[in-house]
């Protein structure tokens, strides 16, 4: 450190030390006076004796109470600040966090589901962001909030953990000081002479510090103890003893001597490594499913004493017995959940260091003693399995210990999910990445890899797009494997052998939509530069598409075929109409599918589209209903956005948000689902965090192992569960319309539509995101995020209605 640097550091340190640490415990005779006696809060609030985290707290009535903090040149934060406090909202409270400067020097307020934070620098830069909670914060519980300003930006913390951040492009300098007192707990907003934004509940331990504090171990310790207390325990030792007692009660006194306890956990609960599990121990693992359906649970093995437990084996049964004692085959699979690094969270989500993602098969499992490490347990009920209740056990063995037999029960409804995917879908396999795992010239190896990915998608009720990205693969792959449509000497030439073979195989497996034909986004018509339409015209597309229609008819899948020639052309109406017009002339029986990108589809200025695919938050709802009434399906999709709390496939989207992608699409009246990539950026030797570095892994819910073979994820399994939910709903509506309509009403009540004026016009590009201005309210999903069992109960009703 140079002498000048030392002087500068000393000046900053001295300035920080000179500013007071303003702290309020709200104890003593003058509760509104800071603990050092130098600063007084003004306003109204009631002292709640003995109700604080320690000692007393302040209670706000949610109607008129609020406080103000007057800052001046002596006490105001400058280059660094930590604003922190504990609050305990009361039932019905909608405002928290609870601090806001009327001039927006500092803003830190929101609701139980989402909060907003911002700070202005002295030179006028606005640093801001928002943060969505995986589940809404509960009233009646203490929550600790902190907002930290330093020379890199602004960060927020909830209960001691990082939750949000807004980075500055350069050193922030001083925090803006407008001279207007900050509001605390009320009158957070004023408009037209009326005040709003009043907190109802308790406030304790309010601090404004002149330093940036980015670690809160004392808060995490308090929260952990609160969770123990809420579960009825005073210590970790008490929790472990209760687990031993529960194991003995379930399995006999010898089970208390095993080095672990066992618990079953819903697949819709996201378990993070440092979570504290206080749930039920030793209960039988139960599933409910139709024949030809997969269902999932998590199996949690909990070592005692913080001791690592290597080499644990889990043996799953091959059969279960029915009520007559007959052995009936079931397919169980157990996998280790790998916690992946997440370099950057999706917008508004907590920056979690590790997230549960890949599912790794293995014969033995090494369990850490200091972190949760759940296993994933899947059961597949074979087609033809009669309805009834089937029982058996799985065996868990730790080295040097006797096996534990954990009861398993599967209730099978007396109906079967169809082999064919009745919910139309299309999902792209990113073939560009597969080619990196095979040597040049190994066409068979490439096709084998592609087949594994397509098969995995089909097994999870998703239709793969087959051999669509010819322009993204090496010339030798394109020539050997792809149709590579072209016109030579006036005739169409295409290598259809591999495509036809794979499509025939997949249709036997349940493929219900076949995307066929050139995909102009990924060939030289666009990638080569120049005018896109001129380049397409040069390929003689009428001849190519006429050939394709004839070929699909000859192969027997014209009824399932769709043309998907362009992707996300947005408001390029003239270009779109040229493409659709060409296609209608050349292949009038081949329906054209069109994705929207950042435009509000459907739109009446666009002609010749047979299947509209607006992105979830770029939908014109009035036009959608008109198109559907005219017999034209309207699917939906997601692509990097929308962001949580809207459903999506980001790595950090909580499981219920992924399942609600399918359920929500069904609820809001879409007819199908498309997704742009299942395995994006999984090329050979990609950095370990490469898939998750783009859009928080939203296009990567199938990974690749070292040989390129597909590796499933929690997200794939959860999305598949949602697709099965959607399938069951469609089956019920077809078989029993009255029962289906009743379920629809319950689903609409569970996930309400935003209130909007249906007469308000939604233009193609304005408002920019039509769904957000009309029917789609991300926070409407919070009830089911808070209590996933609400959806599981409704799913049970669907199953029972079909069962009867």
Where on the chain are the PLM-derived regions?
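Extracellular glycan-associated modules
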Residues: 19-231
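Surface-exposed binding patches on compact interaction domains or structured appendages
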Residues: 238-281, 298, 304-377
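Short, solvent-exposed loop/turn segments enriched in Ser/Thr/Gly
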Residues: 281, 292-298, 373, 386-393
